[in-house]
Amino acid sequence: MKSFFNNKAQTLINLEIKKGKIPKLIKINFNDYFKNKKKFLNKISVLFRNKKIIIRSSFSNEDTNRSSNAGKYESYLNIKYNDVNEIDLKIKRLSRLKNQIRGENFFVQEMVKDVSFSGVVLTRNLENYTKCININFFDGKNTEAVTSGKTETKSILFFENDRFKIPKKFLNIYLCVKEIIQFTNEPDLDIEFAVNKKGLVSILQVRKIVIPKKYKKINLDYKNLFLN
């Protein structure tokens, strides 16, 4: 069976969810861009009119079924939609992060506005690979705080059970994660998200957690645990 996970951009393009949203994006081939910059810069300015954008890698060795290379490549945030010089500069810089860009892609995506908190949710505890809902988050506008390792980040660890519910703050994220699991038919996920002040969840990235073939399994004798 073919994996749902191809590369960062295509995974988001293929994903269909109702419990959250995928910020508008366009995937562009590096070779196509450098052959006709004017065409693509104009396309970006029209598609993201009056918006701020983020330029992100979508290389073939990222977010596949076998490896993630999470955090290996830089993203460029808060660029004005019509600042063609800055957009071109960042695309050039991104292209230099890989030795060979033939057949490789990047994507441009709308920045999420009015962010209340953001972070990463895992469906496994990466220390022992126990199944759970592990949410690492940052209260504030910085959507890269968790992935960049800022010390102000917080975490909760929730084990699904019949007695206790996940805190209301994280309910929409939880529902969105369950929907993505069902859509992708993949229970082991690493998902980047941002939640705005109205509680709307934006999904920024979805990758498969690569589970080692051998790891020490732990049998839990408790049903609910929160770590703050």
How would you label these PLM feature ranges?
Residues 9, 13-16, 23-29, 44-75, ...:
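ATP-grasp fold ATP-binding core
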Residues 37:
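Conserved N-terminal catalytic/coupling substructures associated with nucleotide/phosphate chemistry
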Residues 68-90:
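Flexible beta->alpha loop and helix N-cap segments adjacent to enzyme active/binding sites
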Residues 95:
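Catalytic core of tubulin tyrosine ligase-like
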